[in-house]
């Protein structure tokens, strides 16, 4: 009781102080002041997220658990408060013109987070528990636990996802969702498909985690709003939004395999006006990695990387029913793999080198009216990439290249709440998009001058009915692609059954397509047998079509002081006119070629399991596992040896079993421990001649990759925290044992964990 009286007394003093300091022209009303505390202990909860459902406005509580909103129009609002380790709470508040509204939130401890707010389900902010499709979320807590510096090292810890390195020289990464390779999935930045085929080559390693607030993943087609080419799923990168006045500095030093070093530094700052009408978040990241040679042949398995990223995200509110958002980031990267790094690329035996200058930005204007039941969003984004490259072997002076890539997208989205649509209340969403990608790739030595202009005009609409126990979402997307004669119609249907807060069941059907165009791996040249291997498109290449089905059961329960959640998901995808790569030998200019052709079809099906169990902050365990089959409908030719066609029905580089786990614990208030790991099952990988005599298909062993990290936080002056951390990645030193060696190696014959045993130490300063 004394604590409650003390809290009330402090708030009264705070209100009086606020009223005394209000400048002329601002009334004492139109303000919400609040306090967030723990339910049982009544301790302050700092850095809780507070979100106004009607306006989309948000902030975070300060070190004392306090927050405020100013200049709110009088009326009713719903405030949703969430914090790591606590249940989400929503309350209705009434804002008056005459006085300040004071509200208190008491959050109950919740060990398994189920109420995170997500936008990837239907482009509207909803609780993950109420989303019509399964949305997996990777947060900053996960990035810290696995000590990931970039997006590529984070995605392995999301069920159904697996990141692989496809080049022994330059380190070309791609993410597979439910076994489907990278081009089947769509990478979004703040819900915009601005990541082009060229930026997809190395893009997963060019996005530092300190620019990311969270990553939302939808497996399968799911929503009609994000593109029919998202056959495998979507990876939506939500960048940091300014919500409070804060800053952070990080530094990390790592040693790969005992003789190769990597240094990285990052900085973040966020500034928000007291009345929350404007704010800006800034981030910067620098990373330098030396090349690593695992087998001592003088050729790198991990290339040299030097990358610098700077960016910002800002907002301005002309009124409390409108918001203007701006974002921009630039990346400068030098990447090189091969040998003789002290010489020019054409003086080495093998070099794959790229220099990227990337500039990307966007603007969004959001407007709400009629009590925010209707919202309109206008948006435009643009990205330009200037790439200078060298993909060559045997001291080839003509293997230099230059690529210019421009991508832009513009559109509008309308969302309206309907009190009664046919049989229940609903939320209707529709919109239009137009996107264009202009690519010009020149490689004089390979006599390649590729120009590609892709234009897609799209319309989408979907309606979501909420019927208490059921939620039904039906949507349609229409895409007119300039490389396809007829418009593509892609319907989507999602059904959510929610008999209780603890149980949700979902069914999903979606369709999609992939256009006959160049994708990320087509813009990369693999060195095999001392020469570069290119990819060309077949003259009669048709679009690839897909039909996808999925179903899931999501159950949360408590037993004693423990809380658990288990998600079981089944999926099935049928692909027609599936794209395959076939070795076609030398072209007229004597260059080795592969051709992208249409196969008969393929089926990918299987099951995901995602389980979590936690006991407060004491200990938390999360396990994800996937069992699947990826098979062509008939055997497809992948190469010929002495006139004999070699075929396979099994999709290459796709294991039938893979998974991950994360185990975190805080035995002391300031001490955090984490043990994490991934499992990769056996798969088939093509091995082309050069180092070996003839092409052959290899069956790989399985791998277990374990990581350990410890972090301790010191409280410095004026709420400044200093964290010191250290650990080891790939404790077991699981790494490919049959690497090709020398200048005639097949650089594409590379699989397994992407780095050897690595020791690291780091510091972080935050306020």
Feature map (PLM): residue ranges:
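Extracytoplasmic beta-strand/coil segments of soluble accessory domains associated
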Residues: 152-193, 213
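Short acidic/polar hinge/loop motifs at secondary-structure boundaries
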Residues: 70, 174-176, 192-219, 240, ...
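Membrane-embedded beta-barrel scaffold of Gram-negative outer-membrane proteins
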Residues: 267, 375-391, 506, 540-597, ...
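Short, acidic, small-residue-rich periplasmic hinge/interaction motif at the N-terminus
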Residues: 22-24, 35-40, 48-53, 82-86, ...
């Amino acid at each position: 009781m004394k604590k409650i009286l003390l809290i009330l007394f402090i708030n009264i003093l705070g209100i009086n102080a606020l009223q005394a300091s209000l400048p002329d022209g601002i009334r004492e009303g139109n303000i919400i002041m609040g306090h967030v505390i723990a339910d049982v202990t009544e301790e302050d909860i700092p850095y809780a997220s507070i979100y106004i459902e009607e306006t989309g406005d948000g902030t975070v509580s300060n070190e004392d658990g306090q927050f405020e909103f100013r200049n709110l129009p009088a009326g009713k609002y719903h405030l949703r408060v969430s914090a790591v380790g606590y249940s989400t709470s929503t309350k209705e508040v009434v804002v008056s013109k005459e006085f300040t509204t004071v509200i208190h939130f008491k959050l109950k401890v919740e060990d398994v987070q189920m109420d995170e707010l997500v936008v990837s389900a239907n482009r509207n902010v909803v609780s993950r528990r109420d989303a019509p499709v399964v949305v997996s979320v990777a947060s900053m807590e996960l990035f810290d636990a696995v000590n990931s510096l970039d997006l590529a090292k984070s995605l392995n810890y999301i069920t159904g996802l697996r990141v692989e390195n496809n080049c022994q020289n330059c380190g070309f990464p791609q993410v597979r969702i439910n076994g489907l390779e990278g081009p089947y999935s769509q990478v979004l930045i703040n819900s915009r498909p601005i990541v082009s085929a060229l930026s997809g080559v190395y893009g997963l390693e060019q996005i530092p985690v300190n620019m990311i607030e969270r990553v939302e993943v939808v497996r399968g087609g799911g929503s009609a709003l994000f593109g029919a080419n998202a056959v495998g799923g979507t990876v939506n990168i939500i960048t940091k939004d300014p919500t409070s006045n804060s800053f952070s500095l990080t530094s990390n030093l790592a040693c790969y395999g005992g003789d190769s070093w990597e240094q990285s530094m990052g900085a973040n700052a966020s500034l928000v006006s007291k009345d929350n009408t404007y704010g800006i978040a800034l981030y910067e990241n620098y990373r330098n990695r030396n090349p690593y040679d695992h087998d001592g042949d003088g050729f790198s398995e991990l290339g040299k990387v030097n990358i610098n990223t700077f960016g910002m995200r800002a907002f301005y509110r002309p009124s409390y029913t409108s918001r203007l958002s701006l974002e921009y980031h630039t990346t400068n990267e030098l990447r090189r793999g091969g040998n003789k790094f002290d010489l020019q690329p054409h003086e080495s035996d093998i070099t794959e080198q790229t220099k990227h200058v990337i500039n990307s930005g966007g603007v969004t204007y959001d407007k709400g009216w009629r009590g925010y039941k209707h919202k309109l969003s206008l948006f435009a984004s643009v990205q330009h990439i200037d790439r200078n490259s060298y993909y060559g072997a045997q001291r080839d002076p003509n293997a230099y290249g230059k690529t210019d890539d421009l991508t832009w997208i513009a559109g509008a989205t309308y969302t309206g709440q309907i009190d009664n649509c046919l049989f229940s209340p609903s939320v209707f969403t529709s919109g239009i998009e137009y996107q264009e990608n202009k690519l010009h790739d020149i490689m004089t030595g390979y006599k390649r001058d590729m120009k590609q202009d892709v234009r897609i005009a799209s319309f989408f609409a979907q309606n979501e009915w909420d019927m208490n126990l059921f939620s039904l979402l039906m949507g349609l997307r229409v895409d007119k692609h300039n490389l396809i004669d007829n418009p593509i119609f892609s319907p989507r249907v999602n059904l959510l059954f929610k008999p209780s807060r603890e149980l949700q069941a979902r069914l999903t059907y979606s369709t999609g397509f992939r256009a006959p165009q160049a994708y990320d791996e087509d813009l990369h040249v693999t060195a095999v047998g001392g020469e570069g291997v290119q990819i060309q498109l077949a003259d009669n290449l048709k679009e690839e079509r897909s039909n996808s089905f999925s179903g899931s059961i999501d159950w949360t329960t408590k037993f004693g002081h423990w809380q658990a959640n288990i998600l079981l998901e089944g999926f099935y995808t049928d692909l027609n006119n599936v794209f395959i790569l076939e070795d076609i030998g030398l072209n007229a200019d004597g260059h080795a070629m592969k051709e992208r052709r249409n196969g008969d079809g393929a089926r990918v099906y299987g099951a995901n399991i995602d389980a979590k169990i936690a006991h407060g902050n004491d200990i938390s365990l999360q396990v994800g596992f996937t069992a699947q089959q990826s098979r062509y409908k008939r055997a497809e030719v992948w190469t010929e040896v002495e006139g004999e066609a070699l075929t396979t029905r099994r999709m290459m580089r796709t294991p039938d079993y893979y998974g991950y786990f994360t185990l975190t614990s805080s035995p002391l208030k300031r001490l955090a421990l984490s043990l994490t790991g991934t499992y990769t099952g056996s798969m088939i990988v093509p091995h082309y001649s050069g180092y070996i005599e003839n092409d052959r298909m290899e069956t790989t062993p399985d791998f277990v990759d374990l990581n350990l990290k410890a972090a301790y936080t010191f409280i410095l002056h004026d709420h400044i925290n200093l964290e010191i951390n250290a650990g080891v990645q790939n404790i077991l030193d699981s790494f490919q044992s049959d690497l090709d060696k020398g200048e005639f190696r097949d650089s594409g014959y590379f699989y397994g964990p992407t780095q050897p045993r690595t020791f690291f130490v780091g510091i972080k300063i935050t306020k």
